[in-house]
Amino acid sequence: NLMQFELLIMKVAGRSGIVWYSD
């Protein structure tokens, strides 16, 4: 599911303190 994938990306980005994923 694409939505789940996007959530995963945001999770990883937030965990690394990186904000590179924006809609």
From Swiss-Prot:
**Biological process, per Gene Ontology:** lipid catabolic process
The entry's localization annotation reads: Secreted
Reply yes or no: does the keyword Disulfide bond apply.
Answer: yes
Q: In which tissues is it expressed?
A: Expressed by the venom gland.
Enzyme Commission number(s) from the entry:
3.1.1.4
Gene Ontology terms for molecular function:
metal ion binding; phospholipase A2 activity; toxin activity
Q: How is the cofactor bound?
A: Binds 1 Ca(2+) ion.
Q: What is its main location?
A: secreted
Instruction: Tell me what PTMs the record reports for this protein.
Output: Contains 7 disulfide bonds.
Q: List the disulfide bonds.
A: none
The cofactor named in the record is:
Ca(2+)
What reaction is this protein's catalytic activity?
a 1,2-diacyl-sn-glycero-3-phosphocholine + H2O = a 1-acyl-sn-glycero-3-phosphocholine + a fatty acid + H(+)
Cellular compartments per GO CC? extracellular region
Its domain of life reads Eukaryota
Per its UniProt entry, what is the enzyme's top EC class, as one word? Answer: hydrolase
The answer to whether the entry has keyword Hydrolase is yes
User: What keywords appear on the UniProt entry?
Assistant: Calcium, Disulfide bond, Hemostasis impairing toxin, Hydrolase, Lipid degradation, Lipid metabolism, Metal-binding, Platelet aggregation inhibiting toxin, Secreted, Toxin
The family classification in the record reads: Belongs to the phospholipase A2 family. Group II subfamily.
Query: What does this chain do?
Result: Snake venom phospholipase A2 (PLA2) that shows a moderate inhibition of ADP-induced human platelet aggregation when tested on platelet rich plasma. Exhibits moderate hydrolytic activities and prefers the anionic micelles (dPPC with deoxycholate) to the zwitterionic micelles (dPPC with Triton X-100). PLA2 catalyzes the calcium-dependent hydrolysis of the 2-acyl groups in 3-sn-phosphoglycerides.
User: What is the protein name stated in its UniProt record?
Assistant: Acidic phospholipase A2 CTs-A2
The scientific name of the source species is Trimeresurus stejnegeri (Chinese green tree viper)
